[in-house]
Design a protein with these regions (language model features):
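Short amphipathic alpha-helical interaction segments
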Residues: 212-226
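Short, amphipathic alpha-helical interaction segments positioned at domain boundaries
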Residues: 243-258
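A short, conserved structural fragment
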Residues: 226-236
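Minor-groove-contacting beta-hairpin "wing" of winged helix-turn-helix DNA-binding domains
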Residues: 237-241
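Solvent-exposed, charged/polar functional surfaces in cytosolic regulatory/catalytic domains
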Residues: 107, 224, 254
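C-terminal scaffold of the Radical SAM
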Residues: 1-213
Length: 258
């Protein structure tokens, strides 16, 4: 079970358009704990409108106090066709965001959480297996209204698809909403867009297995990424470097089909 807490600050929750408050969020977490759930996740956001460093850290402290086995800590992104897109709020600048991440990350590490993905932290043994499969470019089924899926076929074709979003259409039997084949020219970008979010090393054989491409297809991009200190390379693995984490968008852009 995953709970979209987002913040324990009632003013921030209202600004985000959420219908719950901090007390209700904590009550839901405690209900999950007393019901016997061994594993659950809390979603938190940072970089919220007018959010200070201390407010962001206070959200984390309150989350840590609830002792979730897994915690997802995302930076707010402004999506198209949303209230924030039409009326952009004042957000923390890059320096403030870095302070929030650096100090928040340290709080989580000191509390016994291990970061295994850009926005995911877990107690030992509680990494989300679905997340790991997803970020490793594995396949997954779309079960239910609005669900997304990915399938790789024996001939190497890769299909992404989604189910009907509205329950009324789904109940009428209109299950499939959209499907798209992942073209060969896009597979390297999609693979690394997923794998480089994980902090673990990327086996080179997995690149070939999941994309159907040879390593030579990305040799120039890999060589440039190494020169820029975005990644390090061994005979068997590629590993994102600290510098690459800071410039992830620039690293991924190398693999875009032009």
């Amino acid at each position: 079970i995953s709970m979209g807490i987002q913040s324990f600050n009632d003013d921030k929750l209202q600004r985000l358009g959420r219908i719950h408050n901090a007390a209700e969020a904590k009550s839901a977490v405690n209900l999950a704990k007393v019901s016997g759930l061994k594993s659950f996740n809390l979603d938190l956001m940072h970089g919220l409108p007018n959010q200070t460093l201390e407010e962001a850290l206070d959200d984390l402290r309150q989350a840590i106090e609830l002792a979730p086995p897994h915690l997802s800590w995302y930076q707010l992104t402004i999506e198209p066709n949303t209230m924030f897109a039409y009326r952009p709020p004042t957000l923390p600048d890059d320096d403030e965001l870095w302070d929030i991440f650096e100090q928040g990350h340290q709080l989580l590490i000191e509390a016994g959480y291990q970061q295994y993905e850009t926005s995911a932290y877990a107690k030992p043994g509680f990494q989300c297996q679905h997340n790991l499969n997803y970020w490793r470019f594995g396949d997954y089924l779309a079960i239910g209204c609005g669900a997304h899926g990915k399938l790789t076929f024996p001939d190497g074709d890769i299909l992404r698809f989604s189910k009907t979003k509205h329950p009324k259409g789904y109940l009428r039997g209109e299950y499939l909403y959209e499907e798209k084949n992942v073209e060969k020219n896009d597979r390297a970008f999609e693979f690394f867009m997923n794998r480089f979010r994980l902090l673990e090393a990327v086996p080179k054989q997995e690149f070939e297995h999941y994309t159907g491409l040879s390593q030579s297809a990305v040799k120039n991009q890999i060589d440039f990424a190494i020169q820029q200190n975005y990644i390090v390379e061994t005979p068997d693995y590629w590993q994102i470097a600290e510098h690459g984490k800071l410039f992830l968008n620039e690293l991924l852009a190398l693999f875009l089909d032009e």
